[in-house]
């Protein structure tokens, strides 16, 4: 369900007319219209409305003794007695930004201390409106020039680094493998997060804040909502799914959100049979519960709990064997956060428990992987003054992974009849770290930030110290520069190919520029990073060092009221080092274009056209073979010239259409999408015949169609 609810917030409520109709507009102090502000009557909140793109609203009024309430996140709630205004005249409501005292800010503040140093900050609306997201919080990142994800998955890869160097954090707790429908290599089609629970999502493309550990590339920080504007029930169905989502208020501003989804494949594969020649079956069943409770004015508690049962059946070719690949996975995790607000600070205690069991089989390869994670942290943010904030903390991250495998004796002999051997491996890691981080608003133009994070070695670990420095310069209210650099460490996540925790290191420096003016946004960046450590690509190649230099450009323009145009491009120069020899990196691109054109008219429909283009990835081909009489298979030998071949250029055009219908308290949303309109065969993997004399290619997603509807009730 969560992949397709993106159109729910694309349109506004159509006013319901009655004998007394109050019309008006909601603006901020600068005269800008406020979109999606809540407008309702105090004694009849279920008949409230949401302002449209121009900040306008219409509300039926039957009792002039009632009170009009107008609210929006980040602004003071406005209350207007109806008897004090002429109902028949157009009403102008001006919202003022929150201007609490320091103590009040401490009680209500939710932004992280490093917020001003994030490259991008997204909220729920940004995710839904994002033309590349498909309603997925992590896929929303792919529209950014900093995103270098090339496998059409939700696994975030930032500025040329591998996904295993980037971390996703939910309410201060790291979530490893934050994707579903994942393969043996960790690639996942969609994330496990529902956008309806998200308050804000911060993207640190480089130099992740050292308030968090175990990341050496980038960081995605997700915060769940802390206030529920209204009760809501959603029912959805589509070509491959059915789902329900319920948001319910409880007393004292507490609330609960419950959602469940079921995915099925028969109809989807049947309609897209020509494009789904390898996919035989898939299923997903998940259940999530998010609870937020306020215990007095100073104490709050949030608990997010999630369960998923998923699997797939797909035809796979590897080396000279072709057969079915089967996967099943069950996962359950909980993330809990307790916050206590003192007079001059915020104490946060966080805990996460994550357990999963995954089974995978292909030919003579069988793998059962059981993982356990327990994370605990305590942080205190101290507001020393209005301009200086210090945060310190300690964290412990315990990870355990057991692999019960049947492994091919010969990597190239994968048929069920080929010899294999049993392996039972258990690895664990304890990451105990302490940190300190400060943010100093030097004046109205300069902001300085710095942090240090060190491990406390256990179990014969090596000592390491991470450090960073950031300097932000605000030229004016529209433009800013951010210069940041640092040294970072993280442990790799064990997988089928390498069953160990490997310490990785990264040195980074980046310069980011941002310009915002009315309906125009422009960002640019230049960065350099050197990543060291025995990073595993597959069972054949281990990268010792990877150096990446990149340049990025992003442009967004809204025009003619209903149109929005987005264009981004990236340049990457990447070099990898293997056994002291240098080669071209897999993601060495002279362009990486992402562009979209969106038309959203709440009275008619929403139409979005997206286009992605980049050079093909580099790969290492098989150059020599020897026939092995013992296995009756040819043994391939890869070229010594790593990444000497390249897949064809990647090009993809998608189109999506949606329509919103309003019926009093309910709404109906219908949607459809056509992906890869031109049915372009974008090469994803090179395949060979039995003696490796001929090659052919597996492709990314071909042309597919998808459609469905969502019914929504506000009460």
Regions found by a protein language model. Give the residues of each.
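Short, acidic, small-residue-rich periplasmic hinge/interaction motif at the N-terminus
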Residues: 27-30, 37-42, 71-76, 85-130, ...
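Flexible loop and strand-edge segments within Gram-negative outer membrane beta-barrel domains
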Residues: 265-268, 278-282, 300-375
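Predominantly transmembrane beta-strands of Gram-negative outer membrane beta-barrel pores used
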Residues: 167, 200-211, 217-225, 232-277, ...
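Periplasmic N-terminal accessory/gating domains of Gram-negative outer-membrane beta-barrel systems
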Residues: 89, 112-166, 172-208, 219
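Gram-negative outer-membrane beta-barrel transporters
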Residues: 442-444, 528-530, 542-623
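Membrane-embedded beta-barrel scaffold of Gram-negative outer-membrane proteins
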Residues: 350-352, 503-549, 554-565
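C-terminal beta-signal and adjacent terminal beta-strands/loops
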Residues: 613-630, 652, 658-715
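Short, acidic Ser/Thr/Gly-rich low-complexity loop/linker segments typical of extracellular
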Residues: 45-56
